[in-house]
Amino acid sequence: MKVLWAALLVTFLAGCQAKVEQAVETEPEPELRQQTEWQSGQRWELALGRFWDYLRWVQTLSEQVQEELLSSQVTQELRALMDETMKELKAYKSELEEQLTPVAEETRARLSKELQAAQARLGADMEDVCGRLVQYRGEVQAMLGQSTEELRVRLASHLRKLRKRLLRDADDLQKRLAVYQAGAREGAERGLSAIRERLGPLVEQGRVRAATVGSLAGQPLQERAQAWGERLRARMEEMGSRTRDRLDEVKEQVAEVRAKLEEQAQQIRLQAEAFQARLKSWFEPLVEDMQRQWAGLVEKVQAAVGTSAAPVPSDNH
């Protein structure tokens, strides 16, 4: 009987899980059309689009997503995309502020304040997404070994609400940036040639940055990892080349020291030979003189011996 109840319970849970996954996967997204409408190709919008696509993948709550949610990989990726979005948004806002110089100070301050508020709301919503995923990871870890179906359903609902808030705040931010840009255009149309001259390089720089960011957006994570690997490999090869060059320098220094030592040894040998020659020149005359004196002494002794040995003549005849 217990086995039968267990089988029924497993079948019921599996059916619930299949229904939840089907509901998540087949959920209509009417906001996609609106998303494509406000995306005009600005750098911050491209970065936000990458954040949006990654969040959509997380919202599927597939097995891979659930596995990675138990680690900090998903939140790290989302935070990196969030930082990139805010960085690009700040850069775009700075460019527009440079173009708003001819506008009245009061108008510029009001526009800047409204834009900062919209930017803060967008950042807070993106931070809420990361915080909700961290909370979900903690709850799942606390319920280890138990059913987490209710947590998944609740997380899916929160993510849907957060995505709608993100879309609304992004749309509001885009409209305020359009007002900002219109103010810059109005200032340029007042005949300030200096502003016109500055707008040309800024627009070209924006196109270059948008093209660069757009190309990076199309690269999958694997290609980026390969690019990082290539840069790391090039760095290692550079370090190896420097090490080999350093070893060659050490070898050259050792060879130079060896040559100097051999040269010094040769000089010492030459000095010893010269000193030996000087000693020989000092003592050789003395030896020759002693040899001559000895030879003379020998001759004298021989002469004396010969004289004493001669016969004495006799007087008897």
UniProtKB/Swiss-Prot annotation:
Changing R168A: Decreased binding to LDL receptor. APOE exists as multiple glycosylated and sialylated glycoforms within cells and in plasma. The extent of glycosylation and sialylation are tissue and context specific. Plasma APOE undergoes desialylation and is less glycosylated and sialylated than the cellular form. Glycosylation is not required for proper expression and secretion. O-glycosylated with core 1 or possibly core 8 glycans. Thr-307 and Ser-314 are minor glycosylation sites compared to Ser-308. GO terms for biological process: acylglycerol homeostasis; AMPA glutamate receptor clustering; amyloid precursor protein metabolic process; artery morphogenesis; cellular response to lipoprotein particle stimulus; cholesterol catabolic process; cholesterol efflux; cholesterol homeostasis. Residues 210-290 are annotated as: Lipid-binding and lipoprotein association. It comes from the Eukaryota. Changing R163H: In HLPP3; uncertain significance; ApoE Kochi. The modification Methionine sulfoxide is found at M143. Produced by several tissues and cell types and mainly found associated with lipid particles in the plasma, the interstitial fluid and lymph. Mainly synthesized by liver hepatocytes. Significant quantities are also produced in brain, mainly by astrocytes and glial cells in the cerebral cortex, but also by neurons in frontal cortex and hippocampus. It is also expressed by cells of the peripheral nervous system. Also expressed by adrenal gland, testis, ovary, skin, kidney, spleen and adipose tissue and macrophages in various tissues. It is found in: Secreted; Secreted, Extracellular space; Secreted, Extracellular space, Extracellular matrix; Extracellular vesicle. GO terms for molecular function: amyloid-beta binding; antioxidant activity; cholesterol transfer activity; enzyme binding; heparan sulfate proteoglycan binding; heparin binding; identical protein binding; lipid binding. Changing K164E: In HLPP3; ApoE1 Harrisburg; decreased binding to LDL receptor; probable dominant negative effect; decreased in vitro binding to heparin. Residues 1-18 form the signal peptide. Changing Q64H: Confirmed at protein level. Pfam families: Apolipoprotein (PF01442). Sequence repeats lie at residues 80-101, 102-123, 124-145, 146-167, 168-189, 190-211, 212-233, 234-255. Residues 266-317 are annotated as: Homooligomerization. Binds to and activates LILRB4 on acute myeloid leukemia (AML) cells which leads to suppression of T cell proliferation and promotion of AML cell migration and infiltration. It is linked to Hyperlipoproteinemia 3: A disorder characterized by the accumulation of intermediate-density lipoprotein particles (IDL or broad-beta-lipoprotein) rich in cholesterol. Clinical features include xanthomas, yellowish lipid deposits in the palmar crease, or less specific on tendons and on elbows. The disorder rarely manifests before the third decade in men. In women, it is usually expressed only after the menopause. Belongs to the apolipoprotein A1/A4/E family. APOE is an apolipoprotein, a protein associating with lipid particles, that mainly functions in lipoprotein-mediated lipid transport between organs via the plasma and interstitial fluids. APOE is a core component of plasma lipoproteins and is involved in their production, conversion and clearance. Apolipoproteins are amphipathic molecules that interact both with lipids of the lipoprotein particle core and the aqueous environment of the plasma. This is Apolipoprotein E.
